[in-house]
Amino acid sequence: MMPANEDKENNIVYTGNESSGINFPQTPAHLLKRSHSNILKPPVRLDQLKRDANSNNGNTLKYIQGGKEVSPTKRLHTHAQQQGRLPLAAKDNNRSKSFIFPETSNQSKDADLPQLQNTLSIRKNDQLRKLSQISRSRSRANHNDLLSNSRKLQKYGSVLGYNALPKMKSLVLKDLADSGKNEESSDDDEGNEDSESKLGKKLQSALLKQDSSDGENELNGGLGLFNEQGGLQQLIKNSTKNEQKTKNDKSDKTDDYDIEIAPQRQEPLPYVPEGYSPFQQDDIEKLKTFNSPYKLDLEDEDDTPDKVDLLPLEQIDEEGEKDETECITRNQEEGAALPLLSKNFKEVAAVPTMELVYSEEGLDPEELEDLVT
């Protein structure tokens, strides 16, 4: 079985007031926020209201919660803030505030309905009066503008009822049935006839021709597209005639076709990069037969060495070079220079002589030990 406060959709019922019989589902407090189980506090009931004897002779009521007086609006505001989220039954904009005192709120609404209707009707009547006044003022302004402006009077005078205004020329064409009457009236108005005689005659002649052509078409048996002489049938006849003419022209002019010939395709030019001058065939042959000025023709006809401009080679004796090197080394050994001593030394110390020439013999083991140590 499910615990008592677990079915939050149906079983949990919130009663806003003891006197009111309205119930609606409410989510339990411990399911809204698990960390704080006592967030939703029950609303203040009538038995929790206490009278304040110090103000207004004890007639006012105040909310007393935790030993402090709290106003009803502040109580509702804090209650809505602490709620966290709206209950599941209040998701359709049914706030919990409206269910605290439902009877009093409904009664006040029912009592205020006629007053609201009266105020709305008064506002509508005021708006209609303002609109009518604005429209009247605008019509009067337009009327005054027409009277002050001569052009507007000439255009719209007959509409406004001013029949004494000068008549304007109309672009509407007169009927042909009244042609006789127009001719009789034209005898009276000779001045106007001079200006409009040419154009009127042209229009009348064109309309008479059109009427005569319509009468002939009726006699021939058809009007418009279904006429035998000038309609769909005539178009069909003309198209067949044109097709026959084109066939005859093709048969006569079979040899006169303009044959289109494409131009001969040219070979593409070779690719030449920028800054590169290609060698011609003459240049290549010159390079093949080029004679350098440093080239020597040693093979002459006379085979004489006088013509060759070269220095003769000197022959060097290797034995003589060896003798010279030996003499130089001996002189160096004999004429070894004495070391320069300062003037303070009276006794000349014996300076050991060193062999300058390597005798091609390595060091003894004793000498090697001396070097290492």
Curated annotation (Swiss-Prot):
Pfam families: Securin. Residues 12-26 have a biased composition (Polar residues). A motif (D-box) lies at residues 85-88. One of its GO terms (biological process) is meiosis I. Phosphorylated by CDC28. The phosphorylation may be important for ESP1 localization to the nucleus. Ubiquitinated by the anaphase promoting complex (APC) at the onset of anaphase, conducting to its degradation. InterPro entries: Securin_separation_inhibitor. It is found in: Cytoplasm; Nucleus. Residues 185-194 have a biased composition (Acidic residues). One of its GO terms (cellular component) is cytoplasm. Belongs to the securin family. Interacts with the caspase-like ESP1, and prevents its protease activity probably by covering its active site. Interacts with CDC20. This is Securin. The gene is PDS1.
